[in-house]
Amino acid sequence: MIRQRTTIFNPTKSNDGIIEAVDSSHLQLSSIDYQCEDKFILQTPKFKYIDKLRIQLNQFHSESILFSKYQAGLNIYCKPKIGDEGFNQEEFFNELNQMMTNLFDIPRDGWINSLDTLFYHEPSTGSESFIEYVRKLTGNESNVNLEVSPNIEYVYDGEKVVLKLNGKSLANTTITKNSKFNKEIGLFLIEKGISSEDDIVLSGLRVILNGDDDKNEEYLQKTLFHVKRRQRQSRGTYSSQVKENGMHPFLKTDIHSDIPNDEDLIQCKLYYYLDLNKSFFVDKYQLPKEFTSYVNFGNTDLELPEYKINEWGSEILMEIENNQQISLPLHSRYQLPNNESSIRVTGINDPLIFYGCDVKDSYLLESSPFDNRLDIGGNYERFFTDNTVFYHLSSHENQLQINIPRGNESIKKINFVTNLIFIAGVVLIFYKIVQGIFKRNPSAGTRKNE
């Protein structure tokens, strides 16, 4: 039996007139543009060499309580199973690639090590195969419109799979009983008059459609409960732009924000999270003084060209002072030469800027049905403790474009001539050295005659 929990947020001020029909077999809502989350708990075959796996496809953003803010695109995290005999690397990657091959085009050596986890990120990716896989897992019972760029999260914890979908609801929101599913539907709105940022009050209805319960007499229940959000929205804003500077561009960010002051907060610090594709890197020795701490995972070899690196790139988390403007120096790696253009245009995600705040009564965060924190994945969340809440500043940018200079294919001829001259020079130097030795050391026979 598959467990399905559907949460539907009513954007109006009242639930009156929202439900058009309800009984023990179905629920029909009026046609309103709802935001919706489906959570499925599935029993699937266990992996032999994978301990935990989290796939996050982030395409849809909203400030609704249903949504957590992560870096846009595809984020995949995987922990290998380590037994008494250690870690079987070959078998682990065979099992991981067997699953990934049917969903995403990820090279075996494209992952980076991040803390104790393998991590892969791609800002934009073809998601059709993954969405089709999700349709099959859920038996097409989702109430989220999968045609309108949904967020999808697949989590394998070693025992079961938890699948979360959120985004816009289907145009015709009618949920029916299914003998293979235990369904719980919540229709909620926020009681704004008695809610605050750190204490949100939800009121509404719960509908139970148990597939194996013929009577199902208590299918409709009124409900009201409090939610303490981990992911919160700051009133602050920021904007980023790239200042071209040849192979060493600057990522400039203007920040307009005040430190949060909700009642449950203890202390707050401002953070800057950035992922960079393998065309760029940050040199920790050239960080401006505004960045007071620094964590970087990925290939940190500063000399390798882009085409010699297999990993997707790197992720960076930094604490920053409350400056109004910061400028992060980036370094471009040498690109593969091309005769058609002397510039390669590539994109990076806009950084995420947020306050990380220690909070009182942190146990209330974990009791929220919408808390998305796990011990694997979640971009920046992994670097913070369980008692941290996040206040996200708003930005209108998603992708930033950067021009990288590159040579043309005549560089091969130049390299050949350069190497030839270098070899000739080395040969000449050795020739002169040997010649000098023979001049200083005449033969023994010559010395005897003298």
UniProtKB/Swiss-Prot annotation:
Its main location: endoplasmic reticulum. Pathway: Glycolipid biosynthesis; glycosylphosphatidylinositol-anchor biosynthesis. The keyword Transmembrane helix applies. It is found in: Endoplasmic reticulum membrane. The chain crosses the membrane at residues 414-434. Residues 1-413 are lumenal. Pfam families: PIG-X. One of its GO terms (biological process) is GPI anchor biosynthetic process. Glycans are attached at N172, N277, N339. Keywords: Endoplasmic reticulum, Glycoprotein, GPI-anchor biosynthesis, Membrane, Transmembrane, Transmembrane helix. It comes from the Eukaryota. Residues 435-450 are cytoplasmic. It is a single-pass type III membrane protein. GO terms for cellular component: endoplasmic reticulum membrane; glycosylphosphatidylinositol-mannosyltransferase I complex. Disulfide bonds: none annotated. InterPro entries: Pbn1 (IPR042322), PIG-X/PBN1 (IPR013233). GO terms for molecular function: mannosyltransferase activity. PANTHER family: PROTEIN PBN1. Belongs to the PIGX family. Required for proper folding and/or the stability of a subset of proteins in the endoplasmic reticulum. Component of glycosylphosphatidylinositol-mannosyltransferase 1 which transfers the first of the 4 mannoses in the GPI-anchor precursors during GPI-anchor biosynthesis. Probably acts by stabilizing the mannosyltransferase GPI14. This is Protein PBN1. It comes from Debaryomyces hansenii (strain ATCC 36239 / CBS 767 / BCRC 21394 / JCM 1990 / NBRC 0083 / IGC 2968) (Yeast). The gene is PBN1.
